Amino acid sequence: MEKEIELIRMSSTEIMEKVAAYKDEQIIILNQVNKVSETEQYSPIRADFFLAILCLRGKASLSLNNNSYEIGRNDLMICHPQTLLKHGMIGDDFECCGFCLSPKYAKRIFVMSTSANNWYSRLYLEQHPIISLNDEESQLFCQYYNLLNSKLTSTPHRHQKELINALLQAFIYEIQDSMEKYIQLKPVAFNSSNNLFNAFMELLI
């Protein structure tokens, strides 16, 4: 069992490297997932990262924590660390874009956005990891993706780190706005009970 878990964790890193347009210790910018070999598609991986992938066209089937899903155009898949991910069929015309964040970095960005709604969004996404976006929301995701990719691969500058952090924080708010058609996010009330709740949730990320 330990060997099986170790192989799952090893393959998750190897697979992400094969579809990476950019990678460092904190973030991986993903490109074509259909570059993954057929053997790897059917091998489960234990994700050791926060993952966000948008389907641009085509279809794919997959299993998340032993639950089957289909992803199509404008579907956004968000997975949290330790999700058991298994690819099924990936269409020849399947195209996607997205990124991975290390758990430590994702936690820092998550907390920096300072919204109590983050926790409600997280709980919802754990039960509903795939959400459908409209064309405008998908275009917005691609804009964030392209800007992140551009900034990460450009010549480093003094405020690059702060800029990347700000872009990812803005992305979190955009996703929360997109989720309002699915769930009613509660207004943020900054009081002692919410502060305790947020502190407790930080320990769980």
PLM segments and residue spans:
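Amphipathic, well-ordered alpha-helical segments in soluble domains
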Residues: 51-54, 140-147, 167, 171-174
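Short acidic-glycine-tyrosine-enriched beta hairpin
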Residues: 66-80
